[in-house]
């Protein structure tokens, strides 16, 4: 995209309330999927359950893709045993809540990110119609089989 067109494009996106740094950061995504699709993704409400080995990398990809509204659920803290497989497990995060740590990281990548942290252990009884319909996308990275089953049933039903 030539410079003048790009400047007009950025100005156009600012009218939709986008932070210019986020747009520049996601320029390659926008070039690939288009501005309308990017706007849909950026404003989607996403729930991520679990921030361990799979969930941590998933969260990083969501934030770096420009998604602004992410709710994360994880009751756990980072431990020594997490260092070999979890992206956010560092000396600084040791014994700290996973949800809080990833939220801080998200703001360093995208200052417009709105991360909601739920420091709780999700139970199968928590999976209700109201719970699943609050989000546009639900990503399951938890290690509780009963929660996984209820979540799949609820998502298919609602």
Role assignments for model-derived ranges:
Residues 20-47:
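N-terminal charged helix/coil linker that caps or initiates catalytic domains
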Residues 41, 131-136:
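A short, aliphatic-rich alpha-helical micro-motif
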Residues 49-50, 73:
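Conserved N-terminal Rossmann-fold NAD(P)-binding element of oxidoreductases
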Residues 54-55:
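Hydrophobic/small residue at the entry helix of a nucleotide-binding pocket
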Residues 67, 72-110:
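Glycine-rich phosphate-binding loop and adjoining beta1-alpha1-beta2 segment
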Residues 119-126:
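Conserved SAM/SAH-binding loop
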Residues 137-158:
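ADP-ribose/adenylate-binding Rossmann-like module
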């Amino acid at each position: 995209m030539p410079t003048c067109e790009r400047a007009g494009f950025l100005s156009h996106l600012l009218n939709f309330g986008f932070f210019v740094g986020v747009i520049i950061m996601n320029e390659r995504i926008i070039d690939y999927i288009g501005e309308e699709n990017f706007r849909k993704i950026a404003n989607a409400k996403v729930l991520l359950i679990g921030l361990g080995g799979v969930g941590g990398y998933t969260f990083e990809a969501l934030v770096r893709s420009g998604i602004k509204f992410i709710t994360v659920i994880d009751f756990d803290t980072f431990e020594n045993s997490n260092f070999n497989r979890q992206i956010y497990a560092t000396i600084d995060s040791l014994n700290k809540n996973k949800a809080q740590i990833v939220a801080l990281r998200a703001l360093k990548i995208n200052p417009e990110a709105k991360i909601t942290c739920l420091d709780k252990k999700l139970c199968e009884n928590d999976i209700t119609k109201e719970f699943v319909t609050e989000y546009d996308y639900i990503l399951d990275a938890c290690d509780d089989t009963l929660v996984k089953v209820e979540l799949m049933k609820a998502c298919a039903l609602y």
